[in-house]
From Swiss-Prot:
It catalyses: guanosine(527) in 16S rRNA + S-adenosyl-L-methionine = N(7)-methylguanosine(527) in 16S rRNA + S-adenosyl-L-homocysteine. Keywords: Cytoplasm, Methyltransferase, rRNA processing, S-adenosyl-L-methionine, Transferase. One of its GO terms (molecular function) is rRNA (guanine-N7-)-methyltransferase activity. HAMAP family: 16SrRNA_methyltr_G. This is Ribosomal RNA small subunit methyltransferase G. It is found in: Cytoplasm. Its EC number is 2.1.1.170. S-adenosyl-L-methionine binds at G76, L81, V127, E128, R142. The gene is rsmG. The keyword S-adenosyl-L-methionine applies. It is an enzyme of class 2 (transferase). GO terms for cellular component: cytosol. PANTHER family: S-ADENOSYL-L-METHIONINE-DEPENDENT METHYLTRANSFERASES SUPERFAMILY PROTEIN.
C-alpha cells in the first residue's frame, strides 16, 4: 500500500529546494501512474516509489538550469525520464520523447492523455531513423553508455547552435577525451541522492 501523504511530503520538500512547489500534484500523478504500469510492464528497474522520487523526478529536474531554447528532445526517454518531469516544470517548452520500445511509448501516450500534458510528443522509432524537419535546441539523454556514442547517434538531431546535455554520475574523465566539441561539466546535488552527479554540456561547435 502506497502512503500518498509520505510521498507528497517527500515531493514537497525536494521541490521547495528547486523552487518548483506548484508542480507537486502533477508530478505525484505521474509517479503513481508510473508505479502502476511498472508492475506489469517493467518500465524501470526501480521498484520502490520513494526511491523513484529522488532518482527519477528530482534527478530529472536538476538539469533544468542548463536547458537551451524551446525545442527539446529526450533520446532514449524510457518511461519519460527526464522528459516528463521537465515538461511538467516547463509547460512553455516543447518536448519530443523518443524511444524504440513500444510499451514505453504506449505508457507515455497514456501519461499525456490522463495528465493532459500538451507539450510532449512521444515517438516510437530508433534514433538513427528519426529525421525531423528542424534541429533541436537541446538534445538530452541518460541512455547512452558514453558521450562519444551519444554524439555519434544524435548528431543529426541537434541544431547548428544547439546543445547536448548528458546526465552522468561521477565526473566522466575518460569519456571526455575523444570529444571534439567544446564542453563544460556542471556538478549538481539531488535531494535524497548521495554521491556525485554531473551534467555534461556539449556545444555543437568544434574546439579550436
Amino acid at each position: 500500500m502506497i502512503d500518498n501523504t509520505k510521498i507528497r511530503s517527500l515531493l514537497e520538500k525536494g521541490l521547495a529546494e528547486f523552487k518548483l512547489d506548484s508542480i507537486g500534484d502533477l508530478l505525484l500523478d505521474f509517479l503513481l501512474l508510473l508505479n502502476k504500469w511498472n508492475k506489469t510492464y517493467n518500465l524501470t528497474a526501480i521498484r520502490d516509489i520513494e526511491t523513484m522520487v529522488s532518482k527519477h523526478l528530482f534527478d530529472s529536474l536538476a538539469i533544468l538550469p542548463w536547458i537551451k531554447g524551446n525545442h527539446i528532445i529526450d533520446v532514449g526517454t524510457g518511461p519519460g525520464l527526464p522528459g516528463i518531469p521537465l515538461a511538467i516544470a516547463k509547460p512553455d517548452l516543447q518536448f519530443v520523447l523518443l524511444d524504440s520500445n513500444g510499451k514505453k511509448i504506449r505508457f507515455l501516450n497514456e501519461v499525456k492523455r490522463q495528465l493532459n500534458i500538451k507539450n510532449i510528443e512521444p515517438i516510437q522509432i530508433r534514433v538513427e531513423n528519426y529525421h525531423p524537419n528542424q534541429g533541436f535546441d537541446t538534445v538530452i539523454s541518460r541512455a547512452f553508455s558514453s558521450l562519444e556514442q551519444m554524439i555519434k547517434w544524435t548528431q543529426h538531431l541537434v541544431a547548428q547552435d544547439g546543445l547536448w546535455l548528458a546526465m552522468k554520475g561521477r565526473f566522466p574523465d575518460t569519456e571526455l577525451v575523444p570529444i571534439h566539441q567544446t564542453y563544460r561539466v556542471e556538478r549538481y546535488a539531488v535531494p535524497g541522492i548521495e554521491g556525485e552527479r554531473c551534467c555534461v554540456l556539449i556545444n555543437n561547435t568544434n574546439k579550436e
